[in-house]
């Protein structure tokens, strides 16, 4: 329950200050995968209607939530102004985590988790989209994302530009 409160507070903070990319459709109030698909479809139809070609690259970050750098995430928090209790709780949430596997009652030794957060966490997805938000700023082409699935879309305005556009993806 506590994790849900932190997740809600962090999400509200990020939405209020426009810290989440408009093209990230997952875990956002009033947005979903249908919005992502409709937006991509709209951009494709618009470019095709204008007689232009489009390139699409679709990415799925494998074990995305597991790969989030804890230190990097805490640096990100500080850079966007997250502090106080949310920073303190998030630091504790991400620190000193361990895991083990139990199969048929036999348990492995506990090992430290060095990146990511607990599986099935309510807070994990919000942390992931915040952590990856800068991806949308550095990509030259359009990026649309739903959680850890991303679509890069590039439009060829001039056929002579085709190799450069393809290379930019």
Regions found by a protein language model. Name each.
Residues 1-118, 154:
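Conserved pre-catalytic core of RNA-dependent polymerases
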Residues 30, 125, 162-166:
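Flexible, glycine- and charge-enriched loops at secondary-structure boundaries
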Residues 36, 127-131, 165-169:
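Hydrophobic alpha-helical membrane-association signature
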Residues 59, 147-148:
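Active-site flanking residues adjacent to catalytic metal/cofactor-binding acidic residues
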Residues 81-88, 145, 159-169:
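Polymerase palm active-site segment centered on the conserved acidic dipeptide of motif C
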Residues 120, 124:
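Short, conserved phosphate/pyrophosphate- and ester-handling motifs at nucleotide-, phospho-/glycolipid
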Residues 140-144:
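Conserved helix-loop-beta segment at the catalytic/binding core of cyclic-nucleotide signaling proteins
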Residues 150-159:
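RNase H catalytic domain
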